[in-house]
């Protein structure tokens, strides 16, 4: 049986600034695992470290073998990330952006993956020749997820895909994420909408100040008084302006 993603004692940061300290985390194969936490907790830093975008220490394995720190080698192992900034090509069409995600595939397989992406995202199919830069934020987010799927990832990492979206679009996007999971893709989801993320996940981790403070079955955490109290506290911190610096979420 595949071992999925296993993280032990992960340390990461930016230069002399340490953001993550001793992170232990698992994303079992075939499961949808969510990581939540307040602003500045280190959630985005976690995904950047796992994607090889910043140096990391500790042990990270995928399917039982060490995960390299080189982004290209990580992609070749079957991992894909959708960053918070989407990183689309605004002057290229929806179809062209999607096809870039499958540039390593043979032409026939790339066409099949494109058709599959349009099945998941019918709105993209309707706008396949529209320029990405003219789309709404929600449509661009769907395009970013669709492009990541083009490479046939075995593990899909999503960095706050619902950030800045209207509630209806959040529901639509997370429903698609759940469909992708049901299609057999292992997912590690970093999400700022705690209740909605826990509602679609199997496992969950709560990160605060660069450390895992809670973990368990998502349903159990969803009903946890401790989690609700922690997030009430996190909201107060953000409102009073004493939260950690942005960019290390």
Segments and roles (model prediction):
Residues 2-249:
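Glycine-rich phosphate-binding loops of nucleotide-dependent enzymes
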């Amino acid at each position: 049986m595949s071992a999925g993603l296993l993280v032990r004692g992960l340390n990461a940061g930016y230069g002399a600034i340490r953001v993550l300290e001793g992170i232990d985390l698992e994303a079992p194969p075939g499961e949808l695992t969510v990581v939540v936490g307040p602003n500045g907790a280190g959630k985005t830093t976690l995904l950047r470290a796992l994607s090889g975008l910043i140096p990391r220490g500790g042990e990270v394995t995928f399917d039982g073998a060490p995960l390299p720190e080189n982004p290209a080698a990580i992609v070749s192992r079957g991992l894909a990330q959708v960053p918070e900034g989407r990183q689309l090509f605004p002057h290229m069409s929806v179809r062209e952006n999607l096809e870039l995600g499958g540039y390593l595939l043979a032409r026939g397989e790339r066409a099949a993956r494109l058709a599959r992406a349009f099945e998941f995202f019918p709105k993209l199919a309707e706008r396949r020749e529209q320029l990405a830069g003219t789309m709404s934020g929600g449509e661009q987010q769907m395009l970013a997820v669709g492009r990541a799927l083009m490479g046939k990832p075995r593990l899909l990492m999503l960095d706050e895909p619902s950030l800045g979206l209207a509630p209806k679009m959040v529901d639509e996007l997370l429903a698609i994420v759940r469909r992708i999971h049901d299609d057999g893709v292992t997912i590690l989801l970093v999400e700022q909408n705690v209740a909605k993320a826990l509602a679609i996940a199997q496992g969950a981790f709560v990160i605060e100040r660069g450390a895992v403070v809670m973990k368990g079955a998502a349903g159990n955490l969803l009903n946890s008084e401790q989690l609700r109290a922690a997030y009430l506290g996190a909201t107060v911190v953000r409102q009073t302006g004493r939260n950690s610096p942005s960019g290390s979420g």
